[in-house]
Amino acid sequence: MKILWLDLNSSYAHSSLALPALHAQVANNPSVTWEIVSATINENPGMTAGEVYRHHPDIVAATCWLFNHEVLMHVLSRVKALLPHCCITLGGPEFLGDNAAFLRRNPFVSCVFRGEGEEVVPQWLRVWNKPNAWEEITGLCYLDKDGNYHDNGLARVANFQSLTPPECSKLFNWSKPFVQLETTRGCFNTCAFCVSGGEKPVRSLPVETIRERIQTIHDHG
């Protein structure tokens, strides 16, 4: 199985933490091959789609944000036309609400994840080509072959502290001028404009774990 991660950002100064966060949880699975196509929203969507096509992936995955949403849809619609049998799956803050309208408006997208993916994406990869089994995957939203909408709720990581750190993934991007280190997930504030507002429970890593991970980053240089 070949997964193509489409890393579409506003500029090359940015790097998605979602890719290494997910890859780290399945890095030991020899049946899964990961490849990356990186692009910015300022590049030609047709050229980006062509680059994805050259990899001939089974699955195309990406994170959808406010700033890349429009261009991402242009790219993925072209990818589906070039690779009609590929499975396109998305995640990110754009899918925290009702996803029925989005899926009907963008039928080239096979499914979207609502919530946190580190535990449920590995489960889905075991049945990615068996849509009849998707109803068991928490957080997955999709349309079945008859066009019926299925909403499997919100996925939350049961044990935040037990996750394999993103920096353990070979796909972690060390080339940027800064490194992202997630020490807390969720927020106790309730800002109306923020998708993390009011997210409970707030989960934090132990100070000792944070210290060890900072040391790992330091040792990497």
Predicted feature locations:
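Glycine-rich beta-alpha loop elements in corrinoid/cobalamin-binding modules
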Residues: 2, 25, 33-154
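Short amphipathic alpha-helical segment that frequently serves as the phosphate-/nucleotide-binding helix
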Residues: 16-23, 73-76, 211
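Radical SAM [4Fe-4S] cluster-binding motif and immediate context
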Residues: 161-221
